[in-house]
Amino acid sequence: SQAAKPGSNDDSCVLEIGNGRARVLLPGDISARVEMRLQREMTRPVSLIVAPHHGSRTSSSRAFVRLAGAPIAWFSAGFGNRYGHPHPDVIGRFQDIGARLHVTAWSGALSWSSRDPDRVGEERLEAPYWRAPVSPVGSVSSW
């Protein structure tokens, strides 16, 4: 197979992190071509996946999404981005396997812990940044 050109999206660092309770897949900006190589090495579903390449149309092939089998899928994409990420077809592929979707453009910053792998924190929805804690008169706020 042809190697990725240096500096191309397919040259992304791919990480799988696990601790015995949960596993997370961080595939960077890889395309479906690199996903095919990863599929040969994937032995079981992950707990959470960050959608490759922000959910672009050229990533997250149907076979890759099924094999990853993540019940939670994150899409790291800016609000109103010019590329239209995440692509509706990719969203549909993750919905087809029943994954819960979290998109930073809609939800803001996301947080997750293997201690409670079914819960995803959404900062914009749960703690609006414009609501600073109120300090008693004369004291200094610690935030």
Question: Locations of the language-model features?
Answer:
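Active-site-proximal loop/helix segments of hydrolase catalytic cores
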Residues: 1-86
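Binuclear metal-ion centers of metallo-dependent hydrolases, dominated by the metallo-beta-lactamase
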Residues: 3-9, 79-143
